Design a protein with these regions (language model features):
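Glycine-rich, flexible N-terminal cofactor/catalytic loop recognition
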Residues: 31-98, 116
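S-adenosyl-L-methionine/SAH cofactor-binding core of RNA-modifying enzymes
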Residues: 71-146
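Electropositive phosphate-/nucleotide-binding environments in soluble metabolic enzymes
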Residues: 13, 27, 64, 170, ...
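Cys/His-rich short segments
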Residues: 3-53
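Short, charge-rich amphipathic segments
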Residues: 1-8, 26, 109-119
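Short, acidic/turn-prone active-site loops that include or flank metal/cofactor-
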Residues: 61, 84-86, 108-110, 154-159
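C-terminal folded domains that constitute the principal catalytic or ligand-binding module
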Residues: 120, 125-127, 134-180
Length: 180
């Protein structure tokens, strides 16, 4: 059983296997289909329920993104929204209201949740993250579906990390879903 292995050997116990949905071969999970793959015997990937819906507006390389990690763990509550929507897709962008959705983005007008009234925080149902290279984010933020939504930011910057991609504007400006 993989849990009995030392921590540094546990990733080696996972096998690279074809995805049951798209048939591409991956180790750990399929970034396209957001399903775990090649789990060792006795290992289960937890399924999480989140208190809010998480929509990740995505315009990057899927294998470079951490959005699929969130989708694998909380499939019912995480939606990856391709941006711009593929031309061949019938799916429109989700519809949000200023009362029930906020964009987690460190803009100049961004507030911390502590600066928003408790009643307004209770009304929030969806957190929207922008997953793209930093230089593309301002363009996405002008999309009519999210342009008029409130922006929220982290109250305290995360500790230094070699994993997160920081923006030149400061350590509190992270560009990965772990910022949540």
């Amino acid at each position: 059983m993989a849990d009995d292995l030392p921590l540094e050997q546990q990733p080696k116990a996972w096998q690279r296997v074809p995805c049951t949905s798209c048939h591409r071969s991956y180790k750990f999970y399929c970034p396209k289909c957001s399903i775990p793959l090649g789990m060792p015997e006795g290992v289960t990937v937890p399924t999480l329920r989140l208190p809010l819906q998480v929509h990740v507006w995505f315009q990057d390389k899927i294998k470079k993104s951490t959005a699929p990690h969130a989708k694998v763990l909380a499939a019912q509550d995480v939606q990856i929204v391709p941006y711009p929507p593929p031309k061949e897709s019938d799916e429109a962008l989700p519809v949000y209201t200023r009362e029930n959705a906020v964009v987690v983005y460190p803009s100049f007008e961004a507030e911390t949740l502590g600066e928003i009234s408790a009643d307004e925080v209770r009304d929030i149902q969806t957190l929207i993250f922008i997953d793209c290279p930093w230089q593309k984010a301002p363009v996405i933020m002008t999309d009519p579906a999210i342009a008029n939504l409130r922006h929220v930011k982290l109250a305290q910057p995360p500790k230094e990390s070699s994993f997160w991609r920081y923006h030149k504007a400061g350590a509190g400006c992270v560009s990965t879903i772990e910022g949540a």
